[in-house]
Amino acid sequence: MVAMPTAWCSIALALLLALHEGKGQVAAAPDQPAPSHRARASHLRPRRCSCSSWLDKECVYFCHLDIIWVNTPGQTAPYGLGNPPRRRRRSLPKRCECSSGRDPACATFCHRRPKPEAVVVPGSGPPPDVFQAGRARPSAGELLQQLRDISAAKSHFARRQQVAVRELRPTHSRRWKR
């Protein structure tokens, strides 16, 4: 026969384990049938939307609400996403599909077009005599003078910094060294 304190500890431990297993599940309402064992075994992750590509890290981070991001030296890896989708989604024109049509932040994120990279094509810039905001380009002499002024200012600053460092150093007389 089991001693009385050991029996109470066993019952308390069994109750604790039973409560811990059901901690994350919502109780079934009396009018709804209880989910099957297979449905309970799979964890449904809350997600805002479904990304067209698993390589789009910004989309995956935005859409999947409870993933854990682990920083590794080479890349940022999402854990907890499950298996990648079985079908190819290259035909989708959008970045992702929202779970709810009433989520304006998701609609804005998924349906906006990525900003194209700025590509500079030689010869497609402004005319040589006008520089961007209507300012005339400086002549070669003016540009050379500006570079000389910058160089002189840098050397003057370096000299002042050396003097300041020398003044901060303590000077020791010979009698302190004896």
UniProtKB/Swiss-Prot annotation:
Pfam families: Endothelin (PF00322)
Biological process per Gene Ontology, one example term: regulation of systemic arterial blood pressure by endothelin
Keywords assigned by UniProt, alphabetized: Cleavage on pair of basic residues, Disulfide bond, Secreted, Signal, Vasoactive, Vasoconstrictor
Region entry Endothelin-like, spans: 96-111
Any single GO CC term annotated in Swiss-Prot or TrEMBL for this entry: extracellular space
UniProt subcellular location: Secreted
Site, Cleavage: residue positions: W69, V70
Domain of life: Eukaryota
Single GO term (MF): endothelin B receptor binding
Disulfide-bond pairs as recorded: C49-C63, C51-C59
Signal peptide: 1-26
Propeptide segment residues: 27-46, 70-178
SMART domains assigned to the protein according to its UniProt record, in alphabetical order: END (SM00272)
PANTHER family: ENDOTHELIN (PTHR13874), ENDOTHELIN-2 (PTHR13874:SF9)
Its biological purpose: Endothelins are endothelium-derived vasoconstrictor peptides.
Similarity comment: Belongs to the endothelin/sarafotoxin family.
Name of this chain's protein: Endothelin-2
Gene transcribed to yield this protein: EDN2
